Amino acid sequence: MADSSKKLTVLLSGASGLTGSLAFKKLKERSDKFEVRGLVRSEASKQKLGGGDEIFIGDISDPKTLEPAMEGIDALIILTSAIPRMKPTEEFTAEMISGGRSEDVIDASFSGPMPEFYYDEGQYPEQVDWIGQKNQIDTAKKMGVKHIVLVGSMGGCDPDHFLNHMGNGNILIWKRKAEQYLADSGVPYTIIRAGGLDNKAGGVRELLVAKDDVLLPTENGFIARADVAEACVQALEIEEVKNKAFDLGSKPEGVGEATKDFKALFSQVTTPF
């Protein structure tokens, strides 16, 4: 367990994202345990989180801009990710998709013909999920950070996974490359490979850990963003999950018992990668 007499100073990158904002809120609510900072890439995103001094603006493609945010931190949670955007169609109008962000319309419960996707200039998976994450890992190591929690994705065992075909971005391939880089970095780490994300309430499902995408073909291959956020926060304090990597899914709501004991959950994880 972390030293309970000292607050952990934690930087969360991607703090204004759908999952990142949930994790940021959870950390802020536990001010007895954590001093939290957020890293975002624009003033608009900073204002979205309240605009306080604890919100830093940085560019993950430029390591020098990351150093002020990482000065003096104990831990880093990486929740940055390239975002595939949806091309408008008759079924999904531009108004519906709010500028084309796929996550606002399509989540793990979506079924139907998959529309076309693209990535914004400079925001391709290679740039964000590989180079951007590598820059964060390198800077954190340089600054003496003691623990990095990286949120990845299930599906990395299958090069032909449909997510890789979105915008021809090979997103899972680049994510897995960053995961391996972190595991080899020498910095204590926790890699959480989340299943299909949905926006339902957290704290109501039984969470499951596994490896090698075994949960993906089943109804247990999905998870609420709020539960991923909670797992990130819990991983900061549970020693047993350091230098471990695992898939994270959940049973359907109403099946099993809601997970409350994260130490018991994480004790099931045995794989370093």
Curated annotation (Swiss-Prot):
One Pfam family name is: NAD_binding_10
The catalysed reaction is: dihydrosanguinarine + NADP(+) = sanguinarine + NADPH; dihydrosanguinarine + NAD(+) = sanguinarine + NADH; dihydrochelirubine + NAD(+) = chelirubine + NADH; dihydrochelirubine + NADP(+) = chelirubine + NADPH
List where the protein spans the membrane.
none
Q: What is its EC number?
A: 1.3.1.107
GO terms assigned for molecular function: oxidoreductase activity
Alphabetized UniProt keyword annotations: Detoxification, NAD, NADP, Oxidoreductase
What's the protein called, per UniProt?
Sanguinarine reductase
Q: Which organism's genome codes for this protein? A: Eschscholzia californica
